[in-house]
Amino acid sequence: EIAQCLVGSEMCIRDRTIDYHYGKHLQTYVNNLNNLVPGTEFEGKDLVTIVATAPDGAIFNNAGQVLNHTLYFLQFAPKPAHSEPTGKLAEAIKRDFGSFENFKKEFNAAAVGLFGSGWAWLSADKNGKLHITKEANGSNPVRAGLVPLLGFDVWEHAYYLDYQNRRADHVNELWSIIDWDVVGKRLK
């Protein structure tokens, strides 16, 4: 399913980046996690539970990156139906950020301003309020009890082959392939 989302997304993520990012980086995290979990208290648990409850360490790091990358790649479409969120998500963004443009500005600032490697997330709390967070390394907002809706990977492997040190260009281009229907369904 993830691979289908990437077909034709040449607009801002080139094939060579997909090959490394999806085919090598993500696959390594999956393989590592599959080797680490058997025989532990996390065997048989879903990714969200593992990420939310695992102590810092190898299981958490690999589970976090599998969850993060799965959410990341599934939110893309080569030709999204909408260039902005619709419905309940659009209403929540307007309520919590004033407008979609204000939200994008704040989100871009978080993604570009994150020092080092990590993720920028739009998440919802249990009351439906939206939050923008910056998560270092493989962390995810589920650790704080939030539901991740939209995530931008700002690890260098996500953009360096295409954008070199131009993280802001990478972040700006990702908006063109966001499948707002997928992101909207994550808001409960």
Regions found by a protein language model. Give the residues of each.
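Single conserved hydrophobic/aromatic residue that forms the stacking wall/gate
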Residues: E1-G8
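Feature for soluble, non-membrane regions of globular proteins
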Residues: S9-K188
